[in-house]
Amino acid sequence: MRRCAIAICMMAALAWPAVLVAGQGRQDDVRLDAPSPLAGAREIARRTQTPTTFDRMQRYVSGSGRQLAEQTVDIAQARFDVFVPRKPPPPRGYALLVWIPPQDAYRAPMDWMPTLEAHGMIYVSPREAGNEAIVFDRRMPLALHAAHGIAARYPVDPERVFVGGFSGGSRTALRVALAYPDVFRGALLNAGSDAIGSARLTAPPADLMRLFQTTVRLAYVTGAHDLPNRRADAASQRSMQEFCVQQVHRHSMGSRGHATPDRRAFQKVLAWLDAPLPPSDHATLETCRKGLSERVRADLAQVRGLLDGGDLVAAGMALGDADQRWGGLAAPESVELARRIATGLAETR
């Protein structure tokens, strides 16, 4: 059985009586007063930054005597738009879709409500989390607070918690899903995506990456005429294949451009996203993982060779490339090499 965040599992179990008094239907400007313990600045950085970047950050903070703010969002001031199905929750609890919009507010569209009702799925979208908001300080924490806060108020099935978004919100949703596969089971990526290993999207620590490979579904939903984002989707999907991600689905929305899914498209995509997860193809997965590990080792071996040969600058450049490309899969060796290079450069000054 797929792992889930302990806090969300506990809150889901404790929240069953809350459904008797919590609101149903569409609710605007809602306050959720149960902050996520996984939304602290350090934890987000650990999961989203490259290992060498996170190590430098930690050493800087330690050396300066400062401390990272544990929470960058005041949950008491945060507001959310929510839709709760009117029918009773399924036996294991409601499904949940956390939606990250590109604008400051996005209530559940009327076109989506029949599908949300049919799936027994709650919709929640944070306010003031649009493209102008800082990703790591506000957009990601609010998505985590939304998931945790809803699970504190309603019975939620931790195996059916999803994140999604449109345009820039979709890119943020992919970051959230990649960094938190222990919270989210899938992502609805609507007209916005990035490739793992690019400057925008870092592979998380190895244990989280392995979980992401097998338990997180990615549904790419983009208009047929939205050519820039179709190209971005193609690059993102190639990277998912390279990083051994098993559950990827592409859905093109007919003659539409840069737009959110209409009722029919939303229904089709959610049917795939919310279906039972099929068994993993272990043989194919292990073959892919072996090849991936070999490529990581080869890049790190190149860095070691340059470092042992005394070419610190070239070693640093090669390590920078490997650190960005492989992220958490290259740790802890990438961190050890970075420290050696930094020490060597300091000694030559």
Language-model-derived ranges and their functions:
Residues 193-270:
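The feature captures the conserved acid-bearing segment of alpha/beta-hydrolase catalytic domains
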Residues 92-103:
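Short beta-strand element of the alpha/beta-hydrolase
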Residues 159-212:
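Primarily recognizes the serine-hydrolase "nucleophile elbow" in alpha/beta-hydrolase
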Residues 86-93, 135-167, 183:
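Gly/Ser-rich "nucleophile elbow"/oxyanion-hole loop immediately N-terminal to the catalytic nucleophile
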Residues 25-37, 243-247, 264-349:
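Alpha/beta-hydrolase-fold serine-hydrolase catalytic core, especially in secreted/extracellular enzymes
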